[in-house]
Amino acid sequence: MSLPLTEEQRKKIEENRQKALARRAEKLLAEQHQRTSSGTSIAGNPFQAKQGPSQNFPRESCKPVSHGVIFKQQNLSSSSNADQRPHDSHSFQAKGIWKKPEEMPTACPGHSPRSQMALTGISPPLAQSPPEVPKQQLLSYELGQGHAQASPEIRFTPFANPTHKPLAKPKSSQETPAHSSGQPPRDAKLEAKTAKASPSGQNISYIHSSSESVTPRTEGRLQQKSGSSVQKGVNSQKGKCVRNGDRFQVLIGYNAELIAVFKTLPSKNYDPDTKTWNFSMNDYSALMKAAQSLPTVNLQPLEWAYGSSESPSTSSEGQAGLPSAPSLSFVKGRCMLISRAYFEADISYSQDLIALFKQMDSRRYDVKTRKWSFLLEEHSKLIAKVRCLPQVQLDPLPTTLTLAFASQLKKTSLSLTPDVPEADLSEVDPKLVSNLMPFQRAGVNFAIAKGGRLLLADDMGLGKTIQAICIAAFYRKEWPLLVVVPSSVRFTWEQAFLRWLPSLSPDCINVVVTGKDRLTAGLINIVSFDLLSKLEKQLKTPFKVVIIDESHFLKNSRTARCRAAMPVLKVAKRVILLSGTPAMSRPAELYTQIIAVKPTFFPQFHAFGLRYCDAKRMPWGWDYSGSSNLGELKLLLEEAVMLRRLKSDVLSQLPAKQRKIVVIAPGRINARTRAALDAAAKEMTTKDKTKQQQKDALILFFNRTAEAKIPSVIEYILDLLESGREKFLVFAHHKVVLDAITQELERKHVQHIRIDGSTSSAEREDLCQQFQLSERHAVAVLSITAANMGLTFSSADLVVFAELFWNPGVLIQAEDRVHRIGQTSSVGIHYLVAKGTADDYLWPLIQEKIKVLAEAGLSETNFSEMTESTDYLYKDPKQQKIYDLFQKSFEKEGSDMELLEAAESFDPGSASGTSGSSSQNMGDTLDESSLTASPQKKRRFEFFDNWDSFTSPL
């Protein structure tokens, strides 16, 4: 790789260039005096000049503006007299096309080069606000076959403009001043070839003005010329080239000849999504030349920042040997935020601009990126100075950034994070405040510093729920509170409020279950996304404080849930959005969440899309699916909108396991299943029942619970997948539950494995490795009794228990499939519990057993202290009697195996069997295969009473 030029080398090159220009100017002036007499003779006899048959007329530039740097090229086959001019010469003079005969130099025999060129005017971008330049100051070069020639009126004078004004903006953002008139580019090589190929005496010259198109002239006739060197037909297929980062795209319909050209380029790349071809900039010239030779294709070139439709490489080929004017080139760029303290100037090289950069006190130069950066406090100063440079356009930072970083623009702090004051939480329940971890307390401080409007995007398992409750409690005087959550966790939020705000009465919480419920019935109103869209009429009363859990559900502004939620968020004074998976790779999905928190940020999505979504204009409209300037977007969000911490950032503050009860919605249990559950509960409390009959009724109740939980379990799993969970384990016991889960995952095309009692040992190991090595979404559906030991799933950090098991040792062993050697994260354990089912009695029973073992020193695990939302148990005598029955049934030695075998052999459809006639009275229609898992060998439960194995180190 070649090393970049130093400043001294650049200065030396520039000095040599200026010396060469001066020498050439002196030479041209000397030759000009030698030709004065011949030029005067032509002017003195206009009729003779008019009748000269072989005189070639100078070719004007194809630049679309009269003030631009113009190159004039002419092929001279002989040194004859001046060519014919129109009778109405004054009209052509007004347009700047024709010159007076005395202004037209005569070709010098023996000294004319093959091509004759003239450089006139100033830089094209200056056409927007052109200074008045005397005609004598316009620089012009005309080359003969051996020496350069100049007209008598030309003087070599450097362009000077003592007073500079900011350039006016172009009329359209889709075109630059260089090609605003729609003129296609010229290729110097192709023109030279065309001139050489012309017959003797038929030289083609181009005549162009700021308002007319390029026209070739052959044998004294003017003909309209298309944009390429090859004559294009009326029905030629039109397309254009568009910049795409460091490459360019070709937007055009299908053309077999052009596709063949595409395939010959080494940097070709076809995008099947957009159905477009893109190439490296190195192949641009080759592609344009090939496209110009195709009569069926009319390809518009790139729009360059230099104000020309030609690439620098293409135009430079036809201008070899000509002196360039670097001081007249036009550069355009923009400012980009690279940190809280610094911004960067993303712009091409300009000598004047570099000199200005060096005047800034905080300047920094990155050798790798070759870009300059400055402190934010110098942003306004730099932009003001750059506006004094007529050849430079540097766009400042967007208004949104200047508002978000107003304090930094005033006085820059080098701190990586903003200073957040400590919030006064004295009026919040002490139980809640005392249970906040340090990073959670910092999150509450951040939210209050932002006025209660933020996107809390902490990683999953970092306690966004408790932080949101604390933030909302700080603004308790502004309640009623609206909480919008996924349907599967409505009752989990209810339990969380009751746990962390003990001063709150249970009657104050209103969980909306159906579309007929009132949305404003309580001080705290909890509703699902889907029901919110059905209760729009009740949203006329504004809520001042709103919590949105899993706010990424609002990513699509066209959905009913988003249309219902956005008006509520716009009028709310406090908006607390919770999301564990902000879509940083697809900024378009973040837009609705950003404007929900900060409505004044990017009121128009298009401005947001252009800067951060890599917006592209396609034949069918704008494409916002990409991403750009993600570093700047992240800085903006973290400064004003979003707070995000990863598990790796706060791992030292997290426990090894975080257990959580998820109270699933009982409303999903249908009437038939509810009636069966009630009948089974009644059967257990009926008097005059033997112990065996009571135990059979208990097993039936346990099986009915499995059937009742299926819809809510599936809904919760799908919510986890939609929330961005990539890998997790799901444990269940009944075969009907395992089957329902796997069927839904197959229907949703989610990669998963299943291990139950029918899975062989060799197959288990293969499935385990498949799950461990998978990089995509993966769910392991496991049987509690068949896959609770001997397997390692450390690549996941979440375990979901769809069902409870009466022996806590089995549950702990199942948890440890994830919490093993190789696990580098805190493990989340979610227990799905349904009210009104056997879970009401199994969960307290599990806690009681663990507590007894912990007091005896046989277990280090305490479910009560390590689990959220543990305080629920029905208090009426009937429920207590059922709980006692569960406790007595499972406390006898060997009862585990007996009850397990009874549950597995239970056939509710038969009149005989373990359950007797009670199953007939229940009217159950489920068969045995759908209710129980595969039969297990007795050796799988020999470890139940060996509690040391549960507490020994991994």
Curated annotation (Swiss-Prot):
Q: What does the entry state regarding organ or tissue expression?
A: Ubiquitously expressed, with high levels in testis.
Please state the Enzyme Commission number of this protein: 3.6.4.-
Query: Which residues bind ATP per the record?
Result: 458-465
Indicate whether Nucleotidyltransferase appears among the record's keywords. no
> In its UniProt entry, what is this protein called?
SWI/SNF-related matrix-associated actin-dependent regulator of chromatin subfamily A-like protein 1
Q: What are the start and end residues of every segment in region (Disordered)? A: 1-20, 27-238, 904-934
SUPFAM superfamilies per UniProt? P-loop containing nucleoside triphosphate hydrolases (SSF52540)
Q: Where is this motif: Nuclear localization signal?
A: 644-661
Q: Which UniProt key words apply to this protein?
A: Acetylation, Coiled coil, Disease variant, Hydrolase, Nucleus, Phosphoprotein, Repeat
Composition skew (Basic and acidic residues), residue ranges: 7-20
Per its record, the protein catalyses: ATP + H2O = ADP + phosphate + H(+)
* Low complexity bias (residue ranges): 909-919
**Gene Ontology MF term list:** ATP binding; ATP-dependent DNA/DNA annealing activity; helicase activity; hydrolase activity
GO-annotated biological processes:
DNA damage response; DNA repair; double-strand break repair via nonhomologous end joining; regulation of transcription by RNA polymerase II; replication fork processing; t-circle formation
Q: What is the effect of changing residue 764 to Q?
A: In SIOD; increased ATPase activity; abolishes annealing helicase activity; no effect on specific binding to fork DNA; no effect on recruitment to sites of DNA damage; aggregates in the nucleus; decreased chromatin binding
Q: What is the effect of changing residue 548 to N?
A: In SIOD; increased ATPase activity; aggregates in the nucleus
Post-translational modification N-acetylserine, affected residues: 2
Specify residue ranges for compositional bias: Polar residues.
72-83, 171-183, 197-238, 920-934
Describe its assembly: Interacts with RPA2; the interaction is direct and mediates the recruitment by the RPA complex of SMARCAL1 to sites of DNA damage.
Q: Where are the Phosphoserine modifications?
A: 112, 123, 129, 151, 198
> In this protein, which residues make up the domain named Helicase ATP-binding?
445-600
Disease linkage = Schimke immuno-osseous dysplasia: An autosomal recessive pleiotropic disorder characterized by spondyloepiphyseal dysplasia, renal dysfunction and immunodeficiency. Arteriosclerosis may also occur in some case.
Summarize what the UniProt record says about post-translational modification.
DNA damage-regulated phosphorylation by kinases that may include ATM, ATR and PRKDC.
Q: What is the effect of changing residue 645 to C?
A: In SIOD; decreased ATPase activity; cytoplasmic location
Q: Which organism is it from?
A: Homo sapiens
Write down any Gene Ontology CC term: nuclear replication fork
